[in-house]
């Protein structure tokens, strides 16, 4: 397999074949909290992808010099440093979105996807493959967030990226926003539906009967 094919596989596999939310069931809490708007889902995707990619790369660079007894602490220190950078950049340039994301940017530090890839992949792999793996898993996470955020904002408020798409009753149109879509349980339903759709096309992901 060529280098280009390896890169493509590393980036695309976490989107559908091994999605961190849909298959591994990681990072679900933030998926419920930040998907009421497509804008916040998109920014959270960028933030997690940035942190996952660079933390993977950084951990991989020093993996042979990290004592086994403190490896988790070192990984968390690297992840926390990157999260602080992301948080400060959002506060400086996207303050309104930063307020909407609230504590969930800081909680990227404990996101199972970020920590899991650092421990399971970056500690055992070279820097460049680790960087690509981080990008792929960030995009896999973002695929679910953006899909859920699209439907929640569209049907919950009749808007996308804050712009009216469905003519609202309050503005003389025909669409009455569905308030349920703005509540966290709707994200559970949508994620469940998305998992079902993925498994219809990829039946190998269905768990074997006990």
Curated annotation (Swiss-Prot):
Keywords: Cell inner membrane, Cell membrane, Ion transport, Membrane, NAD, Sodium, Sodium transport, Translocase, Transmembrane, Transmembrane helix, Transport, Ubiquinone. It is a multi-pass membrane protein. The keyword Zinc-finger does not apply. One of its GO terms (biological process) is sodium ion transport. The chain crosses the membrane at residues 42-62, 72-92, 103-123, 131-151, 178-198. It is an enzyme of class 7 (translocase). InterPro entries: NqrD, NqrDE/RnfAE. Its main location: membrane. It comes from the Bacteria. It is found in: Cell inner membrane. Composed of six subunits; NqrA, NqrB, NqrC, NqrD, NqrE and NqrF. PANTHER family: ELECTRON TRANSPORT COMPLEX PROTEIN RNFE (PTHR30586), NA(+)-TRANSLOCATING NADH-QUINONE REDUCTASE SUBUNIT D (PTHR30586:SF1). Belongs to the NqrDE/RnfAE family. NQR complex catalyzes the reduction of ubiquinone-1 to ubiquinol by two successive reactions, coupled with the transport of Na(+) ions from the cytoplasm to the periplasm. NqrA to NqrE are probably involved in the second step, the conversion of ubisemiquinone to ubiquinol. This is Na(+)-translocating NADH-quinone reductase subunit D. It comes from Vibrio parahaemolyticus serotype O3:K6 (strain RIMD 2210633). The lineage of its organism: Bacteria, Pseudomonadati, Pseudomonadota, Gammaproteobacteria, Vibrionales.
